[in-house]
């Protein structure tokens, strides 16, 4: 009697074949995440380039916004739909455009197209980092870190306008359009006095400081592996052994501050933690603004400033500035409201 030992070949289905093709070793890895990433990134970028080049915002904001109309890179934009569109997805085949591409562009359909494809493209890029990290068997902290800018994008471009009356109040996709949105945030929400914004600023600027300090310290403590060594010579950038002296760096900062990071793991975790936490906090703050939650309101100072013309603080001055932003910005920025402000209600300094 003969006994045959071996593994029975399982029948491979279409899913296995697709999985093999997606994960094949090639110059640009595709993967399952690529099914989401590449089309969405292509459409988001293509929609933005199309809008900034050819499409006017005259019907939504009363503005010229394309290169074709004379705008430059800083002033062109893909503008948000008008407030009358509310939160409509503005699908090309929807009841608003009814398949008319020109009408769809006039209504602001490119903005929802770019915003939604952009959001899913960013999510696809994060999933790509997860997928490749799993394939090469490393931890997924790159993907976790990238969740921070995704949180900011989604909160600013999607959640905030969803909390307001329509997509109109989201930022337009353009440099000057983003600046307009920042002024709007300050005037209508006093955003710079919001503690979540403060944490975001601390995270971003703190991360820049940490990055500069870390880079400088590594360059300062590179091992000299040959004659005439400097930052760019006498060591191999692909060498397997240690490139710089952590002990020397630790001694240096111990003398500077009295404390220093004791190991590279804690040092690099801190460099990851600071910016990611800051961006996540600012995203949470924007979610609060979507619900019109207030920041710090020092009402007692406002009451005293109203009663005493000689009493003024930097806070009361900022409140006046915010009132000015609202009064002068709203009439132009929200033409659909037909706002008209008589001279006597426009804000003036306490001493005037």
From Swiss-Prot:
The chain crosses the membrane at residues 40-60, 124-140, 152-165, 207-227, 278-294. SUPFAM superfamilies: Bacterial photosystem II reaction centre, L and M subunits. The modification Phosphothreonine is found at residue 2. The keyword Thylakoid applies. A plastoquinone binds at residues 214, 261. Its EC number is 1.10.3.9. It catalyses: 2 a plastoquinone + 4 hnu + 2 H2O = 2 a plastoquinol + O2. Keywords: Acetylation, Chlorophyll, Chloroplast, Chromophore, Electron transport, Iron, Magnesium, Membrane, Metal-binding, Oxidoreductase, Phosphoprotein, Photosynthesis, Photosystem II, Plastid, Thylakoid, Transmembrane, Transmembrane helix, Transport. The modification N-acetylthreonine is found at residue 2. It holds the Pfam family Photo_RC. The keyword Cell division does not apply. One of its GO terms (biological process) is photosynthetic electron transport in photosystem II. It is an enzyme of class 1 (oxidoreductase). GO terms for cellular component: chloroplast thylakoid membrane; photosystem II. Chlorophyll a ChlzD2 binds at residue 117. Belongs to the reaction center PufL/M/PsbA/D family. 2 of the reaction center chlorophylls (ChlD1 and ChlD2) are entirely coordinated by water. Photosystem II (PSII) is a light-driven water:plastoquinone oxidoreductase that uses light energy to abstract electrons from H(2)O, generating O(2) and a proton gradient subsequently used for ATP formation. It consists of a core antenna complex that captures photons, and an electron transfer chain that converts photonic excitation into a charge separation. The D1/D2 (PsbA/PsbD) reaction center heterodimer binds P680, the primary electron donor of PSII as well as several subsequent electron acceptors. D2 is needed for assembly of a stable PSII complex. PSII is composed of 1 copy each of membrane proteins PsbA, PsbB, PsbC, PsbD, PsbE, PsbF, PsbH, PsbI, PsbJ, PsbK, PsbL, PsbM, PsbT, PsbX, PsbY, PsbZ, Psb30/Ycf12, at least 3 peripheral proteins of the oxygen-evolving complex and a large number of cofactors. It forms dimeric complexes. This is Photosystem II D2 protein.
């Amino acid at each position: 009697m003969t006994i045959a030992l071996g593994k029975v070949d399982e029948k491979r289905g279409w899913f296995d074949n697709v999985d093999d093709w997606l994960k094949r070793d090639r110059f640009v890895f595709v993967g399952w995440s690529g099914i989401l990433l590449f089309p969405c990134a292509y459409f988001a970028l293509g929609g933005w380039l199309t809008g900034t080049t050819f499409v006017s915002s005259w019907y939504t904001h009363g503005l010229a916004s394309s290169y074709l109309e004379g705008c430059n890179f800083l002033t062109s934009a893909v503008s948000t739909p008008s407030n009358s569109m509310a939160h409509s997805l503005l699908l090309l085949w929807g009841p608003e455009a009814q398949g008319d591409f020109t009408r769809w562009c006039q209504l602001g359909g490119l903005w929802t197209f770019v915003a939604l494809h952009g959001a899913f493209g960013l999510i696809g890029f994060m999933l790509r980092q997860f997928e490749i990290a799993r394939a090469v068997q490393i931890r997924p902290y790159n993907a976790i870190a990238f969740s921070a800018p995704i949180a900011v994008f989604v909160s600013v471009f999607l959640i905030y306008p969803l909390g307001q009356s329509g997509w109109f109040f989201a930022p337009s996709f353009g440099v000057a359009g983003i600046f307009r949105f920042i002024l709007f945030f300050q005037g209508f929400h006093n955003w710079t006095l919001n503690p979540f914004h403060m944490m975001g600023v601390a995270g971003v600027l703190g991360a820049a400081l940490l990055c500069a300090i870390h880079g400088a310290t590594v360059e300062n403590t590179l091992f000299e592996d040959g004659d005439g060594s400097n930052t760019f010579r006498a060591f191999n950038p692909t060498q397997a052994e240690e490139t710089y002296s952590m002990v020397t760096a630790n001694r240096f900062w111990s003398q500077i501050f009295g404390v220093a990071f004791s190991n590279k793991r804690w040092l690099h975790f801190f460099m990851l933690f600071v910016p990611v936490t800051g961006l996540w906090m600012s995203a949470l703050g924007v979610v609060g603004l979507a619900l019109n939650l207030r920041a710090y309101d020092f009402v007692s100072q406002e009451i005293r400033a109203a009663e005493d013309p000689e009493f003024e603080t930097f806070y009361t001055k900022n409140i006046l500035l915010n009132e000015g932003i609202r009064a002068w910005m709203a009439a132009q920025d929200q033409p659909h409201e037909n706002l008209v402000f008589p001279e006597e209600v426009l804000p003036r300094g306490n001493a005037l």
